[in-house]
Structure formats: C-alpha cells, structure tokens
Design a protein with these regions (language model features):
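A short beta-strand/loop micro-motif in the catalytic core of glycosyltransferases
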Residues: 74, 119, 136-145, 190
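Carbohydrate-associated surface elements
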Residues: 146, 168
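Membrane-proximal helix-turn-helix segments that form the acceptor-binding/catalytic region
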Residues: 57-64, 100, 116-140
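Active-site proximal beta-strand in glycosyltransferases
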Residues: 72-74, 86-116, 141
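Short N-terminal targeting/anchoring amphipathic segment
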Residues: 48, 62-80, 93
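Nucleotide-activated donor-binding/catalytic signature segment of Leloir-type glycosyltransferases, i.e.
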Residues: 218-223, 229-248
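A conserved catalytic-core segment of Leloir-type glycosyltransferases
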Residues: 2-57
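Conserved donor-binding/catalytic core segment of Leloir-type glycosyltransferases
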Residues: 180-198, 204-207, 220
Length: 248
C-alpha cells in the first residue's frame, strides 16, 4: 500500500506459495515444522485457498501482543474467525465488496467439467468460514446497493448491520482533458478480474454484433487478460483480436 511515512506498515509473514515457481518444492523443509505453515502448504497443494484462514491466525498472534496500540481494526474481507475475537476487544469494521459465493456460482455455471467443478468447490472452501463470520459481525461496510443485497442473500447478514459507502473517484486526478483527441466509436470498460462474474462475455458478444452497424468500433478494457483463459478464447472465436485491447 501507498502509505504516509508516519504510518507504520507491519507485513504479515506467510509461505508466499502463489509467488513461487513450484508451490510444492520451493519450500524450506524447516518451515513445515510450524503447524500453520504445514496446513497452508498442504491446503494450497491440494487445490485450496487457505490465505483468509491462515491470515486470521497470524494477525491475531501479532495484534494480540500490542492490542492497546490499536484504536480501530478494519478488515478487508478476510472474514477470518479471529475477527469475532477482535470484535469483543476493539471497535471492528469489515468491508465486504461482494460475497465470493457469487463468483463460485458463476464459475460452476461456466463449465460442464465435473472434475473442474470439484476443484472450484475445493478452492472456495474458505466460504464456510466467511459465511459463519459475516452473519456474526456487528458492522459491515459495503460499496453498493447491489452488494448489500447479495451479501444479505448469500451470507444471510442482517441489512441493519450494513452501511453503504460508495466507491469514489478523485476528480483532481481523473477528469475530461480537452487536449486529448477523442477516438470515435471507442468503448471503454473496467474489469477488475478475468472471471465470468464480470460479464465480459455479454459485452464481447454485443461488440461482435455492433461491428455490422459501426465498422470502426473498438473496445478498450482496463484490466488484465488471463493468458489462455476464457476471455482470450472468446475473443479469438468472435474474431475480435484487432478490436479489443487490454490496459493494466
């Protein structure tokens, strides 16, 4: 994060397996003597995503030593079990952008491969913890009305516990610039992740149809395209390689 020099940043240690070339072999055997490290290593190498769980265990150990130094604890959607401990000790706010269970539903709908569906469910196994914790939190911040409805329905969270704080844009940084020449028939969209939930399929299919009416139309996507992923395959299928650009 980009912090003021006076703000102290405490980095929570982990095995960092997702950053390594081999999640299985690139580990010092002595690190696995720690039970939590061993759990993380086994979980990742069996298709799980243990980071929300392991983060909670590690953050509790660190913060508990100096709990009096903290005025407020703000969780950004880890929804770890340890939040229920902190909630009894300090003012706690949790931001939930959207329930990840919706991602899982859309991903399951995007394939007929039974084995792949099992892997998807395995990766999202942390949702059991997140659903348990979310409904027991006293105050949750959400970024939109649709997120509020989704969290209420997916996680069974009381609407009165949620507060809408809409996403904003710094107009000192982002504003129309008359010096920049407008490109006719260019569309711009934002996709924070290359996953079915973001709905890029519908936009790309619509673009394919609009070419017949607007031959000069193009699409710029602010986001990263997953190499060899579903979106890349769809762009090739619709013959849109020269019409679509990604910027990240």
């Amino acid at each position: 994060p980009d912090l003021d020099p006076e703000i102290k940043l405490v980095k929570i240690p982990s095995l960092g397996l997702y950053e390594k070339k081999s999640k299985f072999f690139d580990v010092n055997p002595t690190e696995l003597l720690n039970p939590l490290n061993l759990f993380e290593w086994l979980s990742v190498n069996s298709g799980g995503f243990p980071e929300p769980y392991t983060f909670g265990k590690r953050i509790k150990k660190i913060i508990k030593k100096n709990l009096d130094e903290y005025d407020v604890i703000h969780d950004n959607q880890s929804l770890a079990y340890e939040l229920l401990f902190f909630q009894k000790k300090k003012p706690l706010i949790t931001t939930i952008h959207h329930p990840i269970s919706k991602d899982l539903k859309y991903q399951l709908q995007s394939t007929d491969d039974f084995f792949l569906k099992l892997l998807m469910r395995r990766w999202h196994s942390f949702l059991v913890m997140q659903k348990f914790v979310a409904k027991r939190l006293k105050k949750i911040v959400v970024p939109s009305n649709s997120s509020l409805e989704d969290i209420k329905n997916e996680f069974q969270v009381d609407e009165n516990k949620m507060e809408r704080v809409m996403n904003g844009i710094d107009l000192k940084l982002f504003y129309p610039d008359s010096k920049i020449k407008k490109i006719p028939f260019r569309l711009v969209t934002v996709a924070s992740a290359d996953v079915p939930l973001k709905g890029l399929d519908y936009l790309l299919e619509a673009l394919s149809d609009l070419i017949k009416v607007y031959p000069d139309i193009s699409l710029s996507i602010i986001g990263e395209q997953r190499k060899g992923g579903h979106t890349e395959r769809l762009i090739k299928k619709l013959n849109l390689q020269k019409r679509v650009n990604f910027f990240s």
